[in-house]
């Protein structure tokens, strides 16, 4: 009986164990099923604020390494997303956002540009202010507007983008500079070009600034009136264009490649005569109506050029050359390629970009190319002390051999029967193909721009900045005009020219910025010092009378030594400045800005070395008043009044000095050159005043 009870007890225990095992397995399986059912596949599209899809945006499950990227249409699909999870959306140059899934299988995202703060904070020179707190006239070119502009220069980015700014392309040659004017001209004799400042470096006058890769630019501010530009003194007399280049975003490492092809074409075809007979008939008729002898009569004119008769053109004359098709390209192409790498952590950041640009001119054999790199490095030594360094290298080549004489008479052939170039006379200097293949005009350019700076946050309200900037530029122009086909070359039996120009610019600046709030009062102040040194040198060697033209100007010794010309020039100038600015705001409604700068320039005589440039501006944010807000009409209503004095030192470094001149005299069968005080080339002007 006891054995039976024990057996029954054992069987009951086994049943209990089996039931427990079953329940355990079932609960585990159920948990797995439940866990699987709590994860879903999420799809969606990622766009920017303009509604354009973002290619390569990163979508990641928060708290995990699981993620994906968007395709060419901005679409993405991500599996195993927790129903209550959070997705992180990020993109280079954009603000990252987080979106809760909340069981949704479709999650779309819109990312805003990380540089959108630039629309709110405006760089004004040696500092920045909120856009709403501006008292001077400043135009901002939005960052999103820059990326779609196929321009190869800083000036090109501004064309049509800022009110009051004119960008005039005076030449269609590739690589040619532009004329930039802000609110028109300010001087009859001096410079009218605005100053361009790149990352705090007053780099030079606008117009031919090719060293900066446009893909590196993230914002541009244009200081237009005297109150805004007075902080730059005489250098800002014609306005200031402030350029800010790209910096790495903390916590990211990015590699990007951009290639842009641009095709150009004439807005309208040239209206040229295609029918030589009709052209000749109308020409004769016009000359007769003007009281002149008809030209197309089957005879030579006074210059010895033969013009066939109308009958000859109708019967035996077969030439109808389309010179425009031999001179112009059908569709010139420009190619812009940029590769950039950037990375940043809490202490160190760097951005390196390399660029190569080629541009075909509208004329055949008229080309421009440039290449270089831009390196920016920043390192925080201590929590309140940062050093920065940058270096830009630019190499350029310009070939200016094309063009000329697309208007050449279509009755003239390109070649003679023996393959030589057809010339109407021995003095025919307008054959475009002959000139293109024998003339030489090439320019090589080199620029190096280096900057170093430190920034010390002394206290939360006070920041001290000091920076050194150096620019070196050099260009070499090679020209050769052959003995045939060019007038200068014919008259001088071949002419070779080698021209070299070299310039150096050094700028040292130290300034302090202070800001503080006291209740409804907000005060900002800046005080600084600047020293600038500039030097220019050129030299030219010209040789004439080449016995052998095989090497052109590569063998200048082949020219007759008696006809060689050597010339050179040199100039140097200095500028010492002190500047200060005060910004005051009361109750976020009433604003005051006062600026003062003193410039001491070596270009002026001893009696007027210094120029003083004060400015002031007041502003009223009317939309912040309660009675205006009640109207519910204005998002922003602001009144502004400004006044300032600016001066211009865009004159020759030695214009105010008496200068020795040269003269030639004949002595003992030869011409001699004399130089001395008896031959002044310019009168002194020690009392010359600033403009």
Question: What is the predicted role of each segment?
Answer:
Residues 245, 339-343, 373-379, 450-456, ...:
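Residues on the lipid-exposed face of transmembrane beta-strands in outer-membrane beta-barrel proteins
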Residues 217, 373-375, 466, 508, ...:
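Extended, hydrophobic alpha-helical segments in both membrane/secreted and soluble proteins
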């Amino acid at each position: 009986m006891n054995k039976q009870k024990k057996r029954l007890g054992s069987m009951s225990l086994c049943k209990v164990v089996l039931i427990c095992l079953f329940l355990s397995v079932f609960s585990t399986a159920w948990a797995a099923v439940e866990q699987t059912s709590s994860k879903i596949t999420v799809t969606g599209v990622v766009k920017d604020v303009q509604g354009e899809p973002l290619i390569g945006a990163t979508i990641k499950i928060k708290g995990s390494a699981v993620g994906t990227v968007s395709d060419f249409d901005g679409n993405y699909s991500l599996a195993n997303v927790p129903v209550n999870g959070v997705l992180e959306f990020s993109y280079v140059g954009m603000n990252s956002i987080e979106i809760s899934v909340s069981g949704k299988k479709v999650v779309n995202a819109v990312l805003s540009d990380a540089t959108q703060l630039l629309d709110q904070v405006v760089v004004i020179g040696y500092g920045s202010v909120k856009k709403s707190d501006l008292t001077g006239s400043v135009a901002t070119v939005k960052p999103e507007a820059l990326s779609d502009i196929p321009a190869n220069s800083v000036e090109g980015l501004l064309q049509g983008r800022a009110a009051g700014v004119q960008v005039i392309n005076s030449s269609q040659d590739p690589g040619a500079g532009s004329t930039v004017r802000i609110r028109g001209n300010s001087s009859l004799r001096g410079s009218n070009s605005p100053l361009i400042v790149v990352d705090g470096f007053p780099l030079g006058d606008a117009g031919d600034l090719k060293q900066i890769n446009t893909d590196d630019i993230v914002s541009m501010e244009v200081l237009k009136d005297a109150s805004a530009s007075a902080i730059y003194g005489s250098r800002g007399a014609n306005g200031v264009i402030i350029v800010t280049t790209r910096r790495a975003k903390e916590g990211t490492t990015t590699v990007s490649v951009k290639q842009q092809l641009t095709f150009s074409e004439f807005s309208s075809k040239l209206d040229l005569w295609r029918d030589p007979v009709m052209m000749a008939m109308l020409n004769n008729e016009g000359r007769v109506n003007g009281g002149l002898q008809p030209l197309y009569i089957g005879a030579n004119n006074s210059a010895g050029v033969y013009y066939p008769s109308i009958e000859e053109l109708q019967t035996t004359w077969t030439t109808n050359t389309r010179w425009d098709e031999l001179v112009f390209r059908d569709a010139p192409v420009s190619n812009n390629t940029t590769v950039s790498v950037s990375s940043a952590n809490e202490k160190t950041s760097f951005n390196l970009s390399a660029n190569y640009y080629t541009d075909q001119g509208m004329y055949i054999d008229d080309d421009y190319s440039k290449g270089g790199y831009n390196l920016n490095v920043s390192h925080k030594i201590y929590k309140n002390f940062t050093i920065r360094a940058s270096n830009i290298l630019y190499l350029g080549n310009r070939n200016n051999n094309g063009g000329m004489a697309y208007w050449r008479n279509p009755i003239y052939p390109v070649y003679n029967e023996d393959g030589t170039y057809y010339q109407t006379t021995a003095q025919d200097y307008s054959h475009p193909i002959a000139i293109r293949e024998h003339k030489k005009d090439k320019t090589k350019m080199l620029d190096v721009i280096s900057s170093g700076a430190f920034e010390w946050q002394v206290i939360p309200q006070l920041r001290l900045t000091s920076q050194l900037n150096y620019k070196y530029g050099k260009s070499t122009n090679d020209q050769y005009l052959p003995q045939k086909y060019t007038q200068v070359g014919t008259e001088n039996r071949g002419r070779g020219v080698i021209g070299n120009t070299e310039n150096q610019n050094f700028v040292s600046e130290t300034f302090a910025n202070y800001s503080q709030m006291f209740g409804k009062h907000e005060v900002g102040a800046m005080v600084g010092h600047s020293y600038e040194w500039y030097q220019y040198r050129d030299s030219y060697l010209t040789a004439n009378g080449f016995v052998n033209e095989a090497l052109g100007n590569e063998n200048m010794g082949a020219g007759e030594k008696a006809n060689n010309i050597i010339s050179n020039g040199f100039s140097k100038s200095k500028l010492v400045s002190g500047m200060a600015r005060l910004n005051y705001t009361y109750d976020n409604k009433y604003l005051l800005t006062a600026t003062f700068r003193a410039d001491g320039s070596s270009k002026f005589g001893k009696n007027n070395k210094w120029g003083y440039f004060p400015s002031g501006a007041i502003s009223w944010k009317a939309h912040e008043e309660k009675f205006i807000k009640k109207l519910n009409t204005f998002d922003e209503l602001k009144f502004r009044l400004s006044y300032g004095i600016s001066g211009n030192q865009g004159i020759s470094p030695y214009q105010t000095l008496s200068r020795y001149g040269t003269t030639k005299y004949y002595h003992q069968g030869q011409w001699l050159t004399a130089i001395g005080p008896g031959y002044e080339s310019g009168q002194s002007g020690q009392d010359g005043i600033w403009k």
